[in-house]
Amino acid sequence: MELLTQLLQALWAQDFETLANPSMIGMLYFVLFVILFLENGLLPAAFLPGDSLLVLVGVLIAKGAMGYPQTILLLTVAASLGCWVSYIQGRWLGNTRTVQNWLSHLPAHYHQRAHHLFHKHGLSALLIGRFIAFVRTLLPTIAGLSGLNNARFQFFNWMSGLLWVLILTTLGYMLGKTPVFLKYEDQLMSCLMLLPVVLLVFGLAGSLVVLWKKKYGNRG
């Protein structure tokens, strides 16, 4: 817990030298792995801010706090394994009360968007859906519910995971190298670190509102 606190303090202070410390960077990789795994894999964790975190990671790479190839590899594994768990939820646990309950608590428009993408584009929808919050968690579950072959799913799963991580991280890296960013580095870094927190709060609040409506809406 102390190491996690030090990590957050180093991030907020933009202390890239401390972040590059082996024990600190190990904790950072662990936290990022868990967040991306959960966001891609478990429906109740779909509100986690994966997109903005990847952009922040790209900036940290630009500042020398993290290595580019190992970060891309590790986070691709996290996203793809999480997506596989989501697929398994649909394939083997889709009819269980727990998974059906999770599905019912996601906003209806995300269900509609995910179903539309999957039925219109098939497996290639995974490539598109990776870049849409909530949908990237829901699509693999729908693929599993449809009885889709695991081997075909895995090909698109790992390809889309790599593209998602690579594109957003590279965007963050390029942002961190721009003259505008270098000029306003302190302010922009603070915004980039606050953005995932703000999105997390809004996502969690939205999920709680949906849960509340499901529980009490029918009583009115």
UniProtKB/Swiss-Prot annotation:
Choose one Gene Ontology CC annotation of this protein and give it: plasma membrane
Instruction: List where in the cell it is found.
Output: Cell inner membrane
Keyword set, alphabetical order: Cell inner membrane, Cell membrane, Membrane, Transmembrane, Transmembrane helix
Q: What happens when the gene is disrupted?
A: Double mutants lacking both yghB and yqjA show incomplete cell division, temperature sensitivity and altered phospholipid levels. They are also hypersensitive to several compounds known to be exported by other drug efflux proteins, including ethidium bromide, methyl viologen, acriflavine and beta-lactam antibiotics. Expression of either yghB or yqjA can restore the wild-type phenotype, suggesting that these proteins have redundant functions. Both individual null mutant strains grow normally at all temperatures.
Known consequence of changing residue 51 to A/N? Answer: Abolishes the ability to restore growth, cell division or drug resistance in double mutant
Entry membrane topology: Multi-pass membrane protein
Pull the Cytoplasmic topological domain ranges from the record. 49-52, 95-154, 213-220
User: Which ranges sit in the Periplasmic compartment?
Assistant: 1-27, 176-191
One GO-annotated biological process of the protein: response to xenobiotic stimulus
InterPro entries in the cross-refs: DedA-like, VTT_dom
Q: Which residues cross the membrane?
A: 28-48, 53-73, 74-94, 155-175, 192-212
- Record's note on what induces expression: Regulated by the CpxA/CpxR two-component system.
Write out the GO MF terms.
transmembrane transporter activity
Explain the purpose of this protein: May be a membrane transporter required for proton motive force (PMF)-dependent drug efflux. Required, with YghB, for the proper export of certain periplasmic amidases and, possibly, other Tat substrates. May play a role in determining membrane lipid composition.
Write out the similarity annotation: Belongs to the DedA family.
Tell me what this protein is called. Answer: Inner membrane protein YqjA
